[in-house]
Amino acid sequence: MEQLYFTEEHKMLRDMVRDFARNEVKPLAQELDERGGFPHESVKKMAELGLMGIPWDEKYGGTGMDTMALVIAIEEIGKVCPSTAATMMAHTSLGTAPIAVFGAEEQKERYLPGLASGKKIGAFGLTEPNA
């Protein structure tokens, strides 16, 4: 099935992210989990690799890759550290996507370059009664 869905670009991304996850993320995962820490170092390196801007238009500093590429990257990171993968996923889908999809052009120009580059981290706020 891989041949039906994965382009050569997807395979290269998968291999690169797999190596990164095993060599850079995995060694930090247990200690971060035990102390409830945020993966600052991993997020910085993910930003340097362009992973924080995978689905966003190059016009705004993203990679211009497709959603499948994003899923591949999240899956590979999630194999070694679900928390780090969740950080990337929340940044992209909850923090950045609303601006990229529904934002006015002015908002996109203002916020997406920082988010796509990973210089800023997208977040999501939720409140519930009695929380």
What are these regions (language model features)?
Residues 1-9:
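Intrinsic disorder at enzyme termini
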Residues 12, 25-131:
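Glycine-rich flavin
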